Amino acid sequence: MNIVNDNYDLLEMKQPYPIWIIDNFLDEEVLKTIHELWPGLDDQNWHGGHEMIDGEKNILEQGMISYDINDTKGYLNEFLTYIHSQDFTDKISQMTGIDNLVGDESMRWSGIRTMVTGGFQAVHSDARLNPESGLRKELTCLIYFNEDWKQEDSGFFEVWNDDMTECTNSISPISNRMVIFLNSDTSYHGVPEVLSERKSITWSILKSGEVGERSKALFVSRPQDDKRVGELGKKRALVKDAHK
């Protein structure tokens, strides 16, 4: 399956952690097809996350809905299956220069994502351990599908430094942009503000290596955030999946 545009543009950022931004990533016909097949908001297969955490309103993420890969059909299912394959994972290995990457057959953190107007996801570092395989969550991959995105739509992917004192980059979620980043305990990122419907597909790539036991994201507070964000983030790391 050939889905990658031969003329993509790759930018690598090394600080505060390795991030690869690839514009014009998908072949134009592939991109057009996915735009056409994107599920409407009235589709019954969308599911939300936790409204409450330990009896408190979830102030970590709201307005973010996911569509399970197992509920997709036809070309969309073929596309999603392929990006988890070892063949495609090897292509990502070539782009990033990281060897011995393994496709995530469990699809644990994968899916079609839409964030609705007014939604947000607080800053966090991703899960580290894939429980099904025992492998390390090495890379997180996202492709954006936001046609006609404008600055005033917000929905920026914020990148924060290791000690959470500075937002070092704000990446625009323009259509056909792929973002890949290297996971660590301090690969802090989030989407604190969404002012227009925001669409993406996300999945993870694994690797063998030393890793802790944390299999959930760990949310942290920005300097301007309510300190309860960090406190609730620790509780959220212990909550079972809302949908699996």
Predicted features along the sequence, with ranges:
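N- or domain-start disorder-to-order transition segments that initiate the globular core
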Residues: 1-8
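Non-heme Fe(II)/2-oxoglutarate
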Residues: 8-95
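A structural signal for short, well-ordered beta-strand segments and their strand-loop junctions
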Residues: 21, 102-105, 111, 180-181, ...
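A structural signal for well-ordered alpha-helical scaffolds and beta->alpha junctions
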Residues: 27, 31, 72-76, 85-89, ...
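Non-heme Fe(II) oxygenase catalytic core, chiefly the N-lobe of the double-stranded beta-helix
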Residues: 39, 71, 80-135
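Proline-centered turn/helix-capping motifs that create local helix->coil transitions or kinks
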Residues: 42-43, 99-102, 147-151
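Catalytic core of Fe(II)/2-oxoglutarate
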Residues: 118-119, 126-137, 146-244
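Eukaryotic charged/polar low-complexity linker/IDR segments
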Residues: 140-142
